[in-house]
Amino acid sequence: MKRLPDNLFVSQVSIPGTHDAATGNGVTLASYSQCQDIDVATQWSIGIRAFDFRPKVKGDYLNINHGIAVTNLRFDDALYLLRDSLKEHPSEFAVIHCLYASGYDSDKTKYETMLRELLSREDLKDYFVPFRRDLTVGDMRGKILLLSRDQYAGKPITGGFFQSWCGWLDWNAQSSCSIIGESAASDYKSPLWVQDYANTKDSEGGVAKKVSAVTEMLEHSTKHVTKDESDVVWVFNFASAYPGSISMANGYRENATYTNAAIIEYLQTHEAGPTGVILMDYCVDRSPNEVDGKYLTRGRELVDTLIANNYKWLERRNKTVYDKALERIDKLYEQLQEAQESIATECADVAAEFEDELAAAKDVIDQQKYEIDSLYAGWLFTESYTVDYIGTYRIIRQIEKDAEKAQAEFDEASGIHAVQAEYIGNDCQIFSLTGERLDALRRGTVCIVKFPDGKVRKVVCK
């Protein structure tokens, strides 16, 4: 994430994540509950930045479980691992999807007390960030955003709460979820789109439905335009599912061979755009984690594809905004050139007086050109960026008007009247200043005109 611009909304980042991340550290009932082949530390090292942790009370501490299956990773150890990883890599950040493993109601009081204590520890609390809809990459660097599906307190101790979570295939429901932070203010609440269709039994064509659900969410997320914080939408798109009547490790593996591949193919064949958080099973290319593993899960390839997608999208967005901005800059340079030529020919007697103003107008355009070049180089453009075309054009036009007025005043003071050629009729007599009879006015030169009423005036043809 080091190369991502600080002003980028976190909601616009494609974040690779792991479903039931801690099962890679070892888990009981592994043939039913395992979803990862590598431990959380290794997941971090390959680029995973979102982690699905399911804590559960175990004696006097919180362990991470997958349902009733117990992993070999305590929740506090997982948080300290992420803290230490962020210390070592302060340009990164981590997102946690947190859900109590099972039996929440029976453990509610104890769990809530233990979780509050853990999140408030002196050696951890400064590494958490409160949720806001407009969190940027700069806000998040070196931090952990913990988002809980259990409302363990009246308001989040840190991070935020998911609301109206949707685990079925209904776009109205999937797009009606939200995340709330510690305040009731609007900037602490964000729309959330969720795809978490998990039970994909073959007898019901569930695998095809799951793949379709994943790619349909990608259609929504990658095409969504976030011009400013009012457009922010967070997205959680679960690649995880199991194609059977009960969850099995090999079921998760089999599903991963379809969903991980579908996401890779989509991102390789469609215009790049943000995916939000993608939570996958088996973030390795073959599972079990062996060269000749049976299941071609392509998880590591998916991680790399999601990371690369950030830069493909930023380049596309950057180029689109830059090209529009550059087109306007070029037009301003044209307007300035036309003004310079007009003043030089039509206001020749006073043109020198406006050289500094024209140079200042050029400086304004040059500065805007420098700004867009710098923004482009740093991938700092946003969809709402615009060049101040109208304001700069008005500056140029005002210089022209001032020059025209100054020339008219000069002509008046010199006894010379500026006229349009068509105002001099055929019944007028035209002479040069030396008295030579002329057939017509000469543009830009002073002539003497004798009108039918007998009046004689010095005029300059404009």
Task: Show which residues each predicted segment covers.
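Conserved, mostly hydrophobic/aromatic
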Residues: 54, 96, 146, 278
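Active-site groove signature of glycoside hydrolases
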Residues: 90-105
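Repeat-associated, polar segments at repeat-unit boundaries in modular proteins
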Residues: 373-411, 461-462
